Curated annotation (Swiss-Prot):
Coiled coil: none annotated. This is Small ribosomal subunit protein eS17. It comes from Thermoplasma volcanium (strain ATCC 51530 / DSM 4299 / JCM 9571 / NBRC 15438 / GSS1). Keywords: Ribonucleoprotein, Ribosomal protein. GO terms for molecular function: structural constituent of ribosome. One of its GO terms (cellular component) is ribonucleoprotein complex. InterPro entries: Ribosomal_eS17, Ribosomal_eS17_CS, Ribosomal_eS17_sf. The keyword Flavoprotein does not apply. Belongs to the eukaryotic ribosomal protein eS17 family. The keyword Ribonucleoprotein applies. One of its GO terms (biological process) is translation.
Length: 75
């Protein structure tokens, strides 16, 4: 069972993902490094939490897009 993320973490991660859609990938470490450069004054723990949620958000978004393509192809 996973942990529940605070609303501000979700909102921040989703805003960043929408603002820079091609910048973030499915790799946590890469996303973490990019966030550290974007937000240098944020604590390491917060960066890790946002990066983790952002990574999952990107993966879910990609899987959803793939599912929609498959459903449209089957129709």
């Amino acid at each position: 069972m996973g942990s529940i993320r605070p609303f501000n973490v979700k909102r921040t991660a989703e805003e960043i993902a929408e603002k820079y859609p091609s910048l973030f990938t499915e790799k946590f470490e890469e996303n973490k490094r990019k966030l550290e450069k974007m937000m240098p004054d944020v604590s390491k723990r917060t960066i890790n939490i946002i990066s983790g949620y952002l990574t999952r958000y990107v993966v879910k978004k990609k899987e959803k897009a793939e599912r929609e393509i498959e459903e449209n192809a089957a129709s």
